[in-house]
């Protein structure tokens, strides 16, 4: 992989981790557990903890199992990132966001035994699961990877 691709991806990973951990620090230090601060009619900060992974799944694995799974996922995504062609920019930054988000949540799990969640989308009769910025980075990263795959498929289809 080209040097520029490595450094720019590393920058995205570090920035994602720093932003995620900075916000989580503010939430943990300035909000009590279960506190909700409404920002917009449909958006609030709501401090909670997730002892599993997405949507509290696999909480029964406890810290050791969840840390092992997270490390395996990070290693796999690093492999995909490293073997990705540098000109596949959406995928490169997508992998970087997935890695940054996974590291952000891994830091929480190692330090606290849970992941700090705080973003709540809600309506008067409905609410979405509470999540954090690391989760959003992972989701956006996955979306960029899928976009890159779609664009590659489309380019290949047009060229034939």
Swiss-Prot record:
Listed transmembrane segments: 6-26, 58-78, 95-115, 127-147
The protein's name in its UniProt record: Lipoprotein signal peptidase
Membrane topology field: Multi-pass membrane protein
UniProt pathway annotation: Protein modification; lipoprotein biosynthesis (signal peptide cleavage)
Function: This protein specifically catalyzes the removal of signal peptides from prolipoproteins.
A matching Pfam family: Peptidase_A8
Encoding gene per record: lspA
Main location: membrane
